[in-house]
């Protein structure tokens, strides 16, 4: 735990008592502050009370006593409309912050020079965060991993000079962290997302920009117009910007050419790494993730040799192009995290052909219409869930398909068909391009069910992160 000593002897209001909210409340109290915490869910309030956290309805509180108001990132700050607690804080002139801001202030207070790498972007941030953490940890350095990736940031160990922090930040967390100042900040990409919470794409992009704007080194993917503009703007403001691209050959910066990762400067181009044979980093989207990780680790003082070793041993993340197993030459890949067509596109682009594609669930707007360019790579599609009829109409005569209905049936049929394929490496790919809620609690449960079904097949050899 990181006790928040910067608030010692002050009184703090807190709203949102989920897992990170309770962890935040405990850290505030451990630092010597008083707290009054609340949540709209009575069960959450009861859990906090049983954990020894002082609670009270903030609608009845005297807001003049509060030094700050700590808001959980899942609670609306601005859109679609501010939560009632936000309105009360603003009316009283009380500053509104989140748990990442508390970490930043405590780090600034007790160990301002400790390495702090923060990662954001619409897609790829969890993989990039996990990859950086893996590379650093593999060298034997003291590494702490947290934030939006699933570990509440204030549950980490106390900041000190030689302890590395690798923190994934959502737009909600950045919006509540005005002092965010990582030694290296990464902005991977920007596409429309969470606009219900930010009001417009421009607002969303402006929030994401804050993470890199105050970074010692701003590492920015420039393959979309928003990030390109941010990189140009920050460079013009005198900030150290390192550009990365998975699509463009750069005159200055880091870019991918297939599996080769290259560095260009002053007319010279050097190969700095290769992802050839690293199954957990297959695909152009992972080339971008790897480029960001390499630059961040170099900026933190790691050697290329250390980075290469970490890349090769990276196991990948569950449900994100996770290599589950092999049966003979057939590879089974779990990409259950792909809950829309935009997220499925990198998976389909990662294999040149002979894809046995399991797709479906609760469809998003546009369905799989945007994926038609990848249809020639698909040997057969196996349609599951509510989207089956809609996707069958989209596939038409372009791709052979069957309506499998259930994931278990799809796995069995796809495994059989792929096993009869004469290609060198047919792949059974779960990349649903849909939400999971028609058949599963969440994408994790769907991915677990896929993994279980694959590993139950006769002759399957389990694997994780191998080529």
UniProtKB/Swiss-Prot annotation:
InterPro entries per the UniProt record, alphabetical: Folylpolyglutamate_synth_CS, Mur-like_cat_sf, Mur_ligase_C, Mur_ligase_C_dom_sf, Mur_ligase_cen, MurD, NAD(P)-bd_dom_sf
Keywords carried by this UniProt record: ATP-binding, Cell cycle, Cell division, Cell shape, Cell wall biogenesis/degradation, Cytoplasm, Ligase, Nucleotide-binding, Peptidoglycan synthesis
Record has Nucleotide-binding as a keyword: yes
Coiled coil: none
Pathway: Cell wall biogenesis; peptidoglycan biosynthesis
Catalytically driven reaction(s): UDP-N-acetyl-alpha-D-muramoyl-L-alanine + D-glutamate + ATP = UDP-N-acetyl-alpha-D-muramoyl-L-alanyl-D-glutamate + ADP + phosphate + H(+)
UniProt GO molecular function: ATP binding; tetrahydrofolylpolyglutamate synthase activity; UDP-N-acetylmuramoylalanine-D-glutamate ligase activity
EC number from the UniProt entry: 6.3.2.9
Keyword Ligase listed: yes
Subcellular location(s) per record: Cytoplasm
GO biological process, any: regulation of cell shape
Binding positions (ATP): 121-127
Family, per entry: Belongs to the MurCDEF family.
Cited function: Cell wall formation. Catalyzes the addition of glutamate to the nucleotide precursor UDP-N-acetylmuramoyl-L-alanine (UMA).
Protein name: UDP-N-acetylmuramoylalanine--D-glutamate ligase
Organism of derivation: Brucella melitensis biotype 1 (strain ATCC 23456 / CCUG 17765 / NCTC 10094 / 16M)
Gene, per the UniProt record: murD
């Amino acid at each position: 735990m990181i006790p928040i000593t910067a608030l010692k002897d002050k009184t703090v209001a807190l709203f949102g008592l989920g897992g990170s909210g309770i962890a935040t409340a405990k850290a505030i109290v451990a630092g010597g502050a008083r707290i009054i915490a609340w949540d709209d869910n009575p069960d959450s309030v009861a859990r906090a009370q049983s954990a020894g956290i002082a609670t009270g309805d903030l609608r009845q509180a005297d807001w003049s006593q509060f030094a700050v108001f700590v808001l959980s990132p899942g609670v609306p700050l601005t859109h679609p409309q501010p939560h009632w607690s936000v309105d009360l804080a603003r009316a009283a002139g009380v500053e509104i912050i989140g748990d990442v801001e508390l970490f930043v202030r405590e780090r600034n207070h007790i160990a301002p020079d400790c390495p702090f790498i923060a990662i954001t972007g619409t897609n790829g941030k969890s993989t990039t965060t996990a990859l950086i953490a893996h590379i650093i940890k593999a060298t034997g350095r003291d590494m702490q991993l947290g934030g939006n990736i699933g570990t509440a940031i204030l549950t980490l160990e106390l900041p000190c000079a030689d302890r590395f922090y690798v923190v994934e930040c959502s737009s909600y967390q950045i919006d509540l962290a005005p002092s965010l100042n990582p030694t290296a900040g990464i902005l991977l990409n920007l596409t429309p997302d969470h606009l219900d919470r930010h009001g417009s794409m421009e607002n969303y992009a402006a929030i994401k920009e804050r993470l890199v704007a105050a970074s010692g080194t701003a590492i920015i993917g420039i393959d979309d117009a928003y990030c390109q503009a941010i990189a140009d703007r920050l460079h013009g403001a005198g900030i150290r910007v390192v550009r990365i691209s998975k699509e463009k050959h750069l005159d200055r910066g880091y870019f991918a050419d297939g599996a080769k990762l290259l560095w260009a400067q002053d007319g010279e181009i050097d190969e700095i790494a290769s992802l050839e044979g690293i199954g957990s980093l297959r695909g152009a989207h992972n080339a971008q993730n790897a480029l960001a990780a390499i630059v961040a680790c170099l900026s933190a003082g790691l050697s290329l040799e250390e980075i290469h070793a970490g890349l090769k041993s990276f196991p990948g993340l569950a449900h994100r192009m996770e290599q589950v197993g092999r049966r003979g030459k057939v590879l089974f890949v779990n990409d259950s995290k792909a809950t829309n067509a935009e997220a499925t596109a990198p998976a389909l682009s990662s294999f040149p052909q002979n894809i046995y594609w399991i797709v479906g669930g609760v469809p998003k707007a546009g369905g799989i219409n945007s994926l038609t360019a990848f249809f020639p790579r698909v040997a057969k599609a196996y349609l599951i869930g509510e989207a089956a009829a809609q996707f069958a109409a989209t596939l038409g005569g372009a791709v052979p398909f069957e309506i499998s209905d259930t994931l278990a049936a799809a796995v069995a049929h796809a495994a059989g068909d792929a096993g009869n394929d004469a290609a060198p490496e047919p792949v059974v790919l779960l990349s649903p391009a849909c939400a999971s809620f028609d058949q599963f609690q969440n994408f994790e449960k769907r991915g677990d069910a896929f993994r279980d079904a694959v590993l139950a097949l006769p002759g399957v050899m389990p694997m994780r992160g191998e080529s």
